[in-house]
Amino acid sequence: MKRVVIALGGNAILQRGQKGTYEEQMENVRRTAKQIADIILDGDYEVVITHGNGPQVGALLLHMDAGQQVYGIPAQPMDVAGAMTQGQIGYMIGQALINELRKRGVEKPVATIVTQTIVDKNDPAFQNPSKPVGPFYDEETAKKLAKEKGWTVIEDAGRGWRRVVPSPDPKGHVEAPVIVDLVEKGFIVIASGGGGVPVIEENGELKGVEAVIDKDLAGEKLAEEVKADIFMILTDVNGAAINYGKPDEKWLGKVTVDELKRYYKEGHFKKGSMGPKVLAAIRFVEWGGERAVIASLDRAVEALEGKTGTQVVRE
């Protein structure tokens, strides 16, 4: 039986153009659960699931902002917002997956672990916050908040001013031993949601930091920790492409890790979207993973069988 870590993209939870109601998100999650159930039952895989949380954290920060302004309820820090949305999305995925498996006559234990991700307090990202989060403000309000709260703010593409936070590299997960133990006991585990809650270690203690960790890079670290055979990133396109959007665009099928590294260094993959996915795939195969896959959520089973998507191998 092979072990696979599946990193779900945002489209598994919220589609473009949707408002983000609970009903919309749950319907998307139910469709995703069918794909995961197919993988578990048809392919006989041990599955660990991770997921994004960008839109949900964004909405939660807006809720907290409004609550503070209207009702005087203190807003919670970013790391707490990350933990809250891990619980929210993990609950939805877990429930949908249990229900889907039961429909097929299968009882399997599913557990969501609110996960802390260790980062280096000396990571250069802390000196260069770059990840926009939360609501848009006018310039005066943004600069006032920056002064009051110690935030870094930037103008975001002419749409207003926003807070930016660091995006440090993940080093590992505090709960890794628990996750491994559950997987070994036959649990389907949902972990490291949204890249996990970023924490640093100071004088032997863990401390949450206000940052955002890329969920695919954190998912890759999780795949190493559980000693996965395959790391599969599911998104809204059917793989990675070079010369994307140009006349000579070429979608990558089976590709060696050395070829993919060359394309990555040549700048073919956009920083905020495909770039981290490709980097995560490279890291996993270089670590010793059998194969990394980047593919469309709708074709997950075929991609795992190697029939579609970008298949990253050693040679």
UniProtKB/Swiss-Prot annotation:
It is found in: Cytoplasm. Keywords: ATP-binding, Cytoplasm, Kinase, Nucleotide-binding, Transferase. It comes from the Archaea. It catalyses: hydrogencarbonate + NH4(+) + ATP = carbamoyl phosphate + ADP + H2O + H(+). It is an enzyme of class 2 (transferase). The keyword Cytoplasm applies. GO terms for molecular function: ATP binding; carbamate kinase activity. Its EC number is 2.7.2.2. GO terms for cellular component: cytosol. Pfam families: AA_kinase. GO terms for biological process: arginine deiminase pathway. InterPro entries: AceGlu_kinase-like_sf (IPR036393), Asp/Glu/Uridylate_kinase (IPR001048), Carb_kinase (IPR003964). The keyword Cell wall biogenesis/degradation does not apply. CDD domains: AAK_CK (cd04235). Belongs to the carbamate kinase family. Homodimer. This is Carbamate kinase. It comes from Thermococcus kodakarensis (strain ATCC BAA-918 / JCM 12380 / KOD1) (Pyrococcus kodakaraensis (strain KOD1)). The lineage of its organism: Archaea, Methanobacteriati, Methanobacteriota, Thermococci, Thermococcales. The gene is cpkA.
